């Protein structure tokens, strides 16, 4: 893991818990897996605890780690560092994605509530128009009651979000996910729908699909054009889900957007999305930061303790699940 992840996730308290659960080689942290020093460490390792900044675990890394039995990830997606070779060896892989989902869900719910009231955009209008409150009437409906939220992706985050929206009893929730169980969607308080049917009904479109080749630019010019005039796009998932050129054009024409992720990230300095009053941009802050990140390291340490005790993992990742998850 990188120094930022180490400092954020492993305080002296977490390090003490780590040392109580396993025999720890010193120094405990490596930033790469190819140097002679790292290879000496790998030769002895039975478990790797990984986080942000972990290099890919390629076949040559595994050849240097004959005793490796588990890779316990103290963050969300393992896609950037887990290779097929890891699964070929039968190595256990776990994730702390459930812990990372919580702050994203909370941020997204807040964004949707802001979207109902058009709060970020009216804040920009207030700076521009000051005491002339006529601008309030220019942002369309300013209520969440009886509105429609379209959730794309009944994922860890998407499913939690649907349940929270149900509990608020404000809006109808349409869920677009071709691989999700319709009964599970209904039980969570959503209604299964196709993207084509859902988009024209969306007062808020919230994206929660994984970044896969087949989901790249799933929201393009045609999909953005299908949204109602005063709709708000919320993206706290992955920037690659949206065609950026199409998004810039749509927002330039008036589409409202709350974007915590973009493609590329960060956007070029000359992107119009920085200055449009109908766009709110945040620098990928929805996920775990600060003290939130220690919930992920705590989950990884729990997985380590369970592994040491011969108990099954709480959140295993398989080759199949990785193919359809973020």
Please describe what each predicted stretch is.
Residues 89-91, 96-148, 160-163, 168:
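Phosphate-binding beta-alpha-beta segment of Rossmann-like dinucleotide-binding domains, i.e.
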Residues 43-44, 64-67, 200-201, 226-229, ...:
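Alpha-helix C-terminal capping/helix-to-coil transition sites in glycosyltransferase folds
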Residues 1-47, 174, 325-326:
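N-terminal glycine-/charge-rich "phosphate-binding" loop or analogous flexible N-terminal tail
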Residues 154-155:
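Glycine-rich Rossmann-fold phosphate-binding loop(s) that bind the pyrophosphate
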Residues 74-75, 92-99, 196, 284:
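Short beta->alpha connector loops at strand-helix junctions that form conserved
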């Amino acid at each position: 893991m990188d120094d930022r992840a180490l400092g954020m996730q492993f305080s002296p308290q977490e390090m003490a818990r780590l040392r109580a659960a396993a025999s720890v080689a010193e120094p405990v942290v490596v930033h790469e897996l190819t140097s002679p020093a790292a290879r000496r460490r790998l030769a002895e390792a039975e478990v790797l605890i990984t986080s942000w900044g972990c290099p890919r675990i390629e076949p040559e890394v595994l050849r240097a780690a004959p005793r490796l039995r588990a890779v316990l990830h103290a963050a969300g997606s393992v896609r950037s560092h887990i290779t097929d070779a890891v699964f070929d060896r039968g190595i256990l892989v776990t994730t702390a994605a459930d812990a990372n989902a919580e702050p994203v869900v909370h941020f997204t719910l807040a964004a949707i509530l802001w979207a109902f009231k058009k709060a970020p955009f009216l804040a920009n209008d207030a700076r521009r128009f000051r005491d002339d409150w006529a601008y309030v009437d220019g942002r369309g409906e300013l209520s969440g009651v009886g509105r429609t939220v379209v959730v794309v992706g009944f994922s860890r985050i998407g499913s939690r979000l649907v349940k929270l929206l149900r509990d608020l009893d404000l809006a109808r929730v349409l869920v677009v996910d071709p691989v999700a169980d319709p009964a599970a969607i209904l039980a969570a308080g959503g209604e299964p729908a196709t993207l084509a049917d859902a988009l024209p009904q969306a007062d808020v479109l919230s994206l929660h699909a994984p970044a896969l080749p087949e989901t790249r630019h799933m929201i393009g010019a045609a999909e953005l054009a299908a949204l109602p005039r005063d709709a708000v796009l919320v993206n706290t998932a992955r920037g690659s889900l949206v065609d950026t050129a199409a998004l810039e054009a749509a927002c330039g024409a008036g589409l409202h957007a709350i974007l915590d992720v973009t493609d590329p990230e960060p956007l070029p300095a000359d992107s119009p999305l920085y200055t449009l009053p109908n766009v709110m941009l945040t620098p990928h802050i929805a996920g775990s930061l600060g003290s939130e990140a220690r919930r992920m390291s705590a989950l990884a340490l729990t997985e380590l303790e369970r592994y040491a005790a011969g108990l099954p993992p709480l959140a295993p990742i398989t080759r199949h699940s990785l193919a359809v998850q973020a």
